[in-house]
Amino acid sequence: MPSPAPSHPWLALSATLAVQVLVTMALVSASVLAPAVAPTLGVAPERIGLYAGVGYLLAMVSGLRSGHGVAAVGALRLTQWALLSCAAGTVLAGLGPVATLLPAAALIGVGYGLVNPATAAVLNHHVPTTARGLFFSTKQTGVPIGVALAGLLMPLGLVTIGWRATAVALGVACVLTALAVQPSVKRLEPPRMPPPPDGALRLLVTVWRHPGLRAMSLASLAFATTQQVFVTFLVALLNLGLGWSLAASAGLLAVSQVASAVARIAFGVVGDHWLAPWRVLVGLGLTMALSCVALGAVALGWREAPLAVVAAVALACAATAMGWNGVFFAALAQRVPREDLPRISGATQFFTFGGGMAGPLLFGESVRAGAGWGWGFVAVALVPLLAAWNLARASRSR
């Protein structure tokens, strides 16, 4: 199918970026608040891995159905429904008893899983092919921006209005963002495509049988594992492992996200103009492995490490472990037809969120079992290292 001329690239970017910021805040806010809130609820802080795991499990499932959702209601309209699902989850978490936290995580996960395939369809329709890396990477800066805002605003809300009111306020913000997108629906909505012909299982089989898509899917699983372990446990590592205050720990998380946002855009430009996105992904896998080893070394042997050293290591982890998403979607858009992008991105996202689900859960349980923060991060480094090797091998065999 020929590519239509781009029409509203910057409006499309603004709308999809706003959506990405809010759903990310909804997903990670619990991780920021866990060290302070979990003990008051009678829950160990490392059990936040279970909450994150439930969210990502539901994101995996909803992402597989995103192609049907785009066909049924439209891509941009689906992002509005995703925001409302996240709003319902945050409000439920804020108003309900402890038993409702996992259902709240499920609602947030459903919304989060719909966003990437839907926003990819919107951007792919409006963005010139020569600038995919820049636009997709800029949209994906919504993830570190969302994490940074959560790191800044959640502790502030905790001490001013309490964590429950803060969660409800975040839900209200999601609803307001869904309403703000409404005036742009007619201008941004891509033409409707027929519903995907294959079911979820067949779609996964299709992706798995394609060598390039299989390598990319496994890389996304590995990179998401690393990313979510970093985002979920950095505050706890600094607060509980290195003795930092919660405010200082969350503040470093926020600053690291600013660095990762800049890195995402830079990697996207590199993928557009100098290196193939595939090669950029290989390099990111290698560097995120080195960064995780450095973070683990700090946690293992240097409790009194200077602030500058800890900050530099955290920035390196954030830039690499959180800098891959935009380049990944740009590479995916190069490999699949425009009309197949929502369903194929939903299928590869199944692996991405599988890493997001398993990583925090396994890491949290390993810490509880006595592995400690340092050795946990050293072990995580093996995951992106193997993914980089597999991507390079698949690239040579094409």
Where are these regions (language model features)?
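Cytoplasmic membrane-interface "Motif A"-like loop-to-helix N-cap segments
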Residues: 72-82, 273-287
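A late C-terminal transmembrane helix in Major Facilitator Superfamily
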Residues: 335-370
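Conserved MFS/SLC helix-loop-helix module at the cytosolic interface between two early adjacent transmembrane helices
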Residues: 61-98
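Juxtamembrane intracellular "pre-TM" segments in multi-pass secondary transporters
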Residues: 2-6, 188-217
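Extracytoplasmic gate region of multi-pass secondary transporters
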Residues: 30-31, 212-257
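C-terminal transmembrane helical hairpin of 12-TM major facilitator-type secondary transporters
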Residues: 277-328
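Helix-loop-helix hairpin linking two adjacent transmembrane segments in secondary transporters
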Residues: 139-186
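Cytoplasmic helix-loop-helix junction between adjacent transmembrane helices
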Residues: 105-143
